[in-house]
Amino acid sequence: MIEKTVFGHLPSGEQVDLYTITNSRGASVSLQTLGAGIVRLYMPDRNGNLGDVVLGFDDPALYTDPDLGYQGLVVGRWANRIRGAAFDFQGQTYHTPMNQGQWTLHSGGRMSFHLWQVKDTAENSITFSRFSPDMEDGFPGNFTLQVTYTLTEENTLRLAYRVDSDRDTVANPTNHVYFNLSCNPAKTIEGHVLTVHAHRFTETDDDQLPTGELGDLTGTMMDFSAPHPIGERIDAPFRAVIPGIGYDNNFCLTKANPRAFAEAAVLWEPESGRRLSVWTDLPGVQVYCGGWLKKDGNPGKGDSKVTYRRGVALETQFYPDSLHCPN
């Protein structure tokens, strides 16, 4: 079933609605019209006890602060980084918002920090839609992005994206939800056990911008081809990882066909027994462990805090900055 409530209001006075889908087993997902974002996701532990496995806030206005990490929000038109805040496409140069140093992060955030329309609802699904006019934030085409969330009886949360444009354009949407399967944001995710089906990663420079090269992660601190705790090597020195930040890297998924629908990663929390399997038809997944979040002070849900290394994002995507690195 699906239930609609009022989540709250933005400083502009705009109302943010919340839609909660619950299956017959009691699992549920709550989704907001701001950024078509995931606010809560209740899933059972090994004993059947339900808990909220995602980070977030009680006040919708907090979701619009980019320093708080795009919690649970849809990112578009182009997720991740664009070098130099510009790209060439079909013989023309397009300039995007320079919102992070000398480059663009998450297209400037407009898709994430604005209200979406509810296009359709069903017993166990909802479709959100947002229209982006031609050249908004520098991207070509009158562009509509839709995302459909479906919660199944098997406790699978499915996200399906659809893009429509009246001219050739670029698109790379993702969702920026952070998981903490312990349901206790006071605990870091360093004890979570992660597997990523990848043997290569996108090499980056000192600004974490892709160089266009693919590196071999076999035997390095980034090698999650066999499961091991996130915290086991997160602070080990490595050229692609910023000291003190930890993992914030694109893994190139090992698939016979880069667009095949296959399992990308598995996240397991030993104490609760909760296990998350992430599937995608995209070639990459950004593993980000919240290292850029403040170490204290960020409010969360209830008395919790959204702080340093309290959640892990597994962002399925085309490779970062592939607008400049087509190969």
Per-segment meaning from a language model:
Residues 1-327:
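An exposed, glycine/acidic-rich loop-and-rim segment of catalytic or binding clefts
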